Amino acid sequence: MQHAETKKGVIYTAVSFIMWGLFPLYWKLLEQLPALDILAHRIIWSFVFMCIVLFFLRQWKIGWQELRSLKKNGGILSLFLASILISINWFVYIWAVNHGFLLEASLGYYINPLVSVLLGILFLKEKLNRLQLVAVSIAAAGVIISAFQYGSIPYVALLLAFSFGLYGLSKKRTSLPSAIGLTLETFMIMPIALGYLLFSGHVQPAGAESGGTWLLLFLAGVFTALPLLLFAEGAKRLPLYQVGILQYIAPTITLLIGLFVYHEPFSSSKAFTFSCIWAALLLFTFSQVKWKRASKSH
């Protein structure tokens, strides 16, 4: 029974990361639209779709109770901060995909686990073991040396990594179930998204006359929610270190799409930075597996 649940966990989690990795192909279908327009529609339609999901899961009451609880314990600010951070992350990713920065976007999600560890040290007083300390140092050195030697700072990668890392940090303060969390986050930011579309006059997207653009924008909400729901189902069946290993599926797919589908240049500065990050991730993953085995032996 346990083996069957673990197998399900691997499948759900792997599929969620594959979907995230393939996202660039989807955003490219909407590249005629400004990134802010795509973001606004993504927020709105994600909220609409998640409301439908909560209705069928019969979790409306739970969602309302969670919102009231957040109001009482002061968690609304953390929820709003999380919604701002995930919106920044979505915007930067969409912009990066449609402006030829796919390789940097993939680098951002390779860096993310290391950034999350760094944020844990700074804000949660977590401690690193020696291997993790070396891993974070190698990654930081790679970015810094690349900046000085090649004059190339991976702004997109750093924005994606830190916005998502800070998003994860803010979510630790709310501890909401994933479906309810996404619903409330999009609910919090939706007035801004609606206001932007109304005041910019971009409610009607370019090419919407055929209906194809509207369909793609609506499905952006569906495809935002689906991998998240699959990930939630998978992650609860797997130990954290296995999820940590599987998460590299998404940036690897994105990297391959950038290189072989859209033929983005792989410069010497990118090669150096990626090499440092991959070396750091190998050490980091090894330290997680080693820690897991040590904890089992005790």
From Swiss-Prot:
Keyword set includes Cell membrane: yes
Pfam family, one: EamA
Residue stretches spanning the membrane: 10-30, 36-56, 76-96, 101-121, 142-162, 179-199, 212-232, 243-263, 271-291
Annotated compartments: Cell membrane
Keyword entries, A-Z: Cell membrane, Membrane, Repeat, Transmembrane, Transmembrane helix, Transport
Topology versus the membrane: Multi-pass membrane protein
Domain (EamA): residue spans on this chain: 17-148, 162-286
PANTHER family noted in UniProt: ACYL-MALONYL CONDENSING ENZYME-RELATED, SOLUTE CARRIER FAMILY 35 MEMBER G2-RELATED
Assigned protein family: Belongs to the EamA transporter family.
Protein name listed in UniProt: Uncharacterized transporter YojE
Source organism of the structure: Bacillus subtilis (strain 168)
Gene: yojE
